Amino acid sequence: MSRMVGTVSRGVRAPIIRSGDDLVEIVTKSVLEAAAQPEDGFAIRDRDVVAMTEAIVARAQGNYASVDDIAADVKEKLGGETVGVIFPILSRNRFAVCLRGIAKGAKKIILMLSYPSDEVGNHLIDPDVMDEKGVDPYRDVLTLEKYRELFGYTVHPFTGVDYVAYYMDLIRDCGAEAEVIFANDAKAILPYTKNVINCDIHTRKRTKRRLIAAGAEKVFSLDEILTAPVNGSGYNENYGLLGTNKATEDTVKLFPRDCQSMVEAIQKKLYDATGKHVEVMVYGDGAFKDPVGKIWELADPVVSPAYTAGLEGTPNELKLKYLADNDFAGLNGEELRQAIKGRIAAKDGSSLVGNMVSEGTTPRRLTDLIGSLCDLTSGSGDKGTPIVYIQGYFDNYTTE
């Protein structure tokens, strides 16, 4: 009988991870125990993928920082006076504790929020209402008074939070003066202060470049705050505060660091135990967008901070329905099946980009695709499966 199952993604349960735990041992043991289960076990094969969420990696590393640690670094880098904080995302989990730290490191915060939504799609206001009011988001800079006059007190549809009031109260509770404006041009902050933290994620380099070109004096992106330990805190030399999550009211879990040696150690340990060459990666947010809530999931700086060499690159695939409807339109049944399998088998290693037979396939990085699959598999709640085991991802229609 020919093979009938393609890609399979499994959530693998693991113990609750604490600081100092040996994650190489835990992940390897969890995968081997899952594979050996009598009812729903599986055979480990070459080119399977083991992935673990960044959260358990950072927890095992003890990569945490406090509000006071953030405040000390902000004060050291920006001077402790008036600081512009621009383009933050609207999130209690992702940004609120970071904002508390920033506020404790300054005397006054000028908060500049993008509108009608933040970078990842959390809406402050309804775009249709914005249009009705005649507001041009590309040019208009709104004060708080004008914003309230036009749009009133709006709350996030999922969380029920008025993020404007929430962020301003949070700043004041930390002892800093708070002022808020609404704009989408980074340069709009400069009449208020020349010292800026730009909090955008995927556009941060361009934003910083434009601010400096326009005369800003001190500009730091979030990935430049806590790039080294402060009073023994955690840190991330590459991403700073990007990718943080709330741990407690006063601490954040930072994005994990030094992950490459860990994924390679897990790969070796699994090979020693099974004789199979398995790929390994760490994943964070998936790179997908909710079509209803309009939220782009990717609030981390990257989908995968570390992965083994076999996960480098992009897919190189043929579009089966194109072949069936065009090249082999006159064939049916087994003859069609064999013709398509022959075309797939004839692929060489050269790129198919620009070739009609690949039109409609997915020219995205493997780690972004697989990381998104992992994020959807593990979820973000109480499934208890921070490890994902994927089989058949690199197979195709010819694989038996």
Question: PLM ranges: what are they?
Answer:
Residues 2-46, 55-400:
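Conserved mixed alpha/beta catalytic, RNA-binding, or beta-rich assembly cores of soluble enzyme
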